């Protein structure tokens, strides 16, 4: 394939890293049909790797995770002259992501499906397929993140992508060491602008393809509310203050999340924030901002990525939502519960934040950082009792 003449410095550096990569240069590229994964495949081909495309069929219908994505991914493989394979993961996606998401919202938590999908539906199955079906030792994806191998700690370390606006390390904290040792992220040191330019240089059909702006399930159904309404019938309940004063009504707690201020449908003398979802009483509890902050949290099911599990308290930065800025906190390890041991995740901790936080939503991830390095992460628990989960 003839290439254009304009090459970014970041693209040239990425190409150099791929050419000097230690070990076998044979890889399966996870192709979604978007520009990021398309360029990932193109750079690997340009660097001389043996490349095969792999697309996971997640859902039926139209959209990036469905027919449209399959067609675009196949077109990219044809353009690059590489094989294209499709693996039907619809049943796994329905069970591990869709049903868990619905169950979580119904139970009053705010699940993080992208992290669960990365571990259970995407990276794990892709690595297994690549090794067993094609004898390929590595996989590559278009994620904006970096991996450092063989540091002083002897672990594969996960780092933020250099483009802070596109960094996806928050969703990748749950990947195990074995997976990180076999994954390649060629775009980790590119900006999105670099990616567009490089895709244009390669003449990729997806170079100007618009980005998905929401969770794939929300895009697929038109909105998150439409997705939830497909599975959960309306269930009217009360919106109350902490003292039980009724200030409004709702048609399902699944449409709310901790910290939410807009769209409550409540007229009050001052702005109110969601502070609790009570599935047993089918209530949404709200409070003024002065009463809505939390200075502590309990995190369970922790995956320690770049360091060994700490035995003593430590200071670090924590990110509690994908789009939120990291904040400083004091982490203290806690004894594991029986449930933690059953899930083979016997690591819990207590966090005390330097400043009150307003979006501590059970089910979301708390990801721990030291500068750009992901130390680990886990799931925010429903309560803040340091003795029980």
UniProtKB/Swiss-Prot annotation:
Catalytic machinery residues: 117 (nucleophile), 216 (cysteine persulfide intermediate)
Q: What is its EC number?
A: 2.8.1.13
Matching entries from InterPro entries are given as: MnmA-like, MnmA-like_C, MnmA-like_central, MnmA-like_central_sf, Rossmann-like_a/b/a_fold
Its recorded reaction(s) are:
S-sulfanyl-L-cysteinyl-[protein] + uridine(34) in tRNA + AH2 + ATP = 2-thiouridine(34) in tRNA + L-cysteinyl-[protein] + A + AMP + diphosphate + H(+)
Decide whether keyword ATP-binding is in the record: yes
UniProt GO molecular function: ATP binding; tRNA binding; tRNA-uridine 2-sulfurtransferase activity
The entry's ATP-binding residues are 30-37, 56, 142
What NCBIfam families does this protein's entry cite? PRK00143.1, trmU
UniProt function note: Catalyzes the 2-thiolation of uridine at the wobble position (U34) of tRNA, leading to the formation of s(2)U34.
Which family, according to UniProt? Belongs to the MnmA/TRMU family.
Q: Which HAMAP family match?
A: tRNA_thiouridyl_MnmA
What name does UniProt use for this protein? tRNA-specific 2-thiouridylase MnmA
Q: Which organism is it from?
A: Synechococcus sp. (strain CC9902)
